[in-house]
């Protein structure tokens, strides 16, 4: 059956004792072969999928609440509820359940699980029912003892609840309460407190509906004022009738809605303020009370949401300039509470709720309210705005982009939020922290949508950097015009720290937008002024900002840092910190350590060439000496490019065995005379020997030795002492690697390709021709390398690329070292 009578929502109780909406569908009961019994089936109204398939277990306790709810537990921690649109549908399904369990449909609970001994169970079942004493003043103590003794036993609780319900006993007890209060009978009032508290712990919806009715609820609260453990009674009724007043900011025409609002407020008050905090053993006994409040709130939000006249009047008065301040304050507080109630809704219902508010113009109303002078009204408006941003940031972004086409930057909604953040009068900036969190959510690309037609990220970030970023950074720019912050009081520093944190977030998550802004506005220089602040937390914020930029390893940022000497304030802060071992000291050292470990060559050279004198005496960490060593290695490679050349040759012969290399070697084989091979002349052994030397000797120490022996080796080579052995072939070239000036047979183009195997010569070395020779000489630990024209021509570009991986081009290095 698919009519509205059987239309239901399926709820499950989560770990936080909150009801989760599992969907809307139509319920039916049928025999399910797989489950071997009659079962409840709920099929989704959207696609017909099965939302619920639950066998009606003869031993499961089902409860009917508020005429339209059926609640039960399928496992120890798995509670289910069906919320019916109509009472008739609930009654039909309840009859089916009672029919399976053999119960009278007039009961509101079929049974409860029994965990007592067989003897107690037999005694309880053998008794026909629980007989209550007459409701008289002299028998109150007896009633209180009966209630207390029934609570531990599920069956006795069931019988007590039925007796209380059938005999109208609660109303009689409340009449006795009025008599006791008139007579000031304190003993009787104490007994009534225990009785009413015990009735709450029975956890029965039918009893709650009697107790929370309009004529009974205040007397129930009165009974709970007289706690025997307190010397004086509480004054809850006085608070509810005189202090807590119901303000009907917009007239509510529906009397049922008005009564539901009153009831929910009072029941919530009973739960939060009147009832004592439940013990561990009593906590689950009030689950029905939690459910009662929850479903009341859902019902209130639904009824208000459906009343278009009410919401239209609400937003009209909110935005009307003629509305006085007190009235507007009440309207905003109502809207805030309305949004708070919506948090009880499930995601799909909440989505419809906020869509309704959006269609009514809630964002336009907030824009008007945030422009007002009343601090309390603005605070409430901020809370409403936070509900909207946290639930649907895309809706807010779409609104502000549309309004930017019509309004000036000063009155844009986001700019109003930024101004309130900047102007927060709270010394601890509580409101500013909240607003900064909302801004972060709005500019976070992770929650931005991308569709086929447009990309929200691109559009919104372009809008934000064009219309809003200058407002956000204004306090930072105004306070950093000198070498030290203009204002260094705590509140200003707190605000600047929030702004820098958001900018750091932008550096991490945005790309070219923030890069262009930082470089064009010189933002990093301004932020680093804050390292001179007396407040360490602000200095650390500035260091985090720079560290995030360096961590990107972006050469645009690196050139910007070097061009403007932006390590200077960092080094100055490090030296001013002295020998103190604190967060600033660690943060700065970590920044330099990152440059060293990641081998950021341009920054390494910049730091050593400009700030080494100030850092060379720091020896309690090896970071700066390590940076110096990195720098010297770079210079060494620039002065001795043969190191890169040798590494690329080694890498080529040891690791690269692709098809092209094999073809080259075959070509070489067929180009070699048989006589060469007969003489036992090895084609590649020199590289093997060089391999062993490279493995045994560190390249740095090897070149240091060469440097010391430079003069003597030059003389030996130049005077022709180097012996040449083996037969020469026109197809071979000879190349020495003794010193930068000892390249005897490099081709004229060798200086253009310092990384090619046949030309390990340094820039500026004149390449002199000599008769081609196939011999290799090793003298003073130096190795001559044999290579071939075929390899040279084909692999020249590839090996040049390999050498570039080791270090930047020489022209770039020479610029850095100059």
Curated annotation (Swiss-Prot):
Low complexity bias locations: 729-775
Chain positions covered by the region annotation Disordered: 670-818
Q: Which gene encodes it?
A: smek1
Q: This chain belongs to which protein, by name?
A: Serine/threonine-protein phosphatase 4 regulatory subunit 3
Q: Where is the composition biased (Acidic residues)?
A: 670-681, 788-803
Q: How does it assemble?
A: Serine/threonine-protein phosphatase 4 (PP4) occurs in different assemblies of the catalytic and one or more regulatory subunits.
Which biological processes are named by the entry's GO terms?
A: DNA damage response; regulation of double-strand break repair
Functionally, this protein is described as follows: Regulatory subunit of serine/threonine-protein phosphatase 4.
* Molecular function (Gene Ontology), one example: protein phosphatase activator activity
Q: Phosphoprotein as a keyword?
A: yes
